[in-house]
Amino acid sequence: GKEKDALKTYEKVLTLDGDNLQANIFLGSYFYLQAEKEKKKLDDDFKKITSPTRMQYARYRNGLSDVLTNSYSKAKTYLQRVLQVFPSMEAGNTLERIKKIEAEIR
């Protein structure tokens, strides 16, 4: 439950101060980790299928596309804000990983 409270609190902070470093770092990291978890589940579930049909493959690709659109894109937005305010190597590395994932999925 506290995770959702923290999420709401940081989102409120950003409505008052869009460049707040802590809030952008937290939200960027949160959405990135959520995306990684969702992607791993999709990958694991798909790997369990020995010979996937076209429909199963299409469902898998659509799932990846949803994760990209919903979670990775949100993470990217917050992490880009971090870099505008503070030269964070970690945020930069995470953005690079997101770019690679975008290239794989598209």
Each model region followed by its residue ranges:
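Residue-level recognition of tetratricopeptide repeat
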Residues: N20, S88-E90
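Short coil/linker segments at helix-helix boundaries
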Residues: L33-Y78
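Canonical positions in the second alpha-helix
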Residues: K12-V13, V82
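Canonical tetratricopeptide repeat
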Residues: F26, T94-R97
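Structural signature of tandem alpha-helical TPR/SEL1-like repeats
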Residues: G1-T9, S71-T77
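Short coil/turn linking the two alpha-helices of tandem helical-hairpin repeats
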Residues: G1, G28, L33-D43, K99, ...
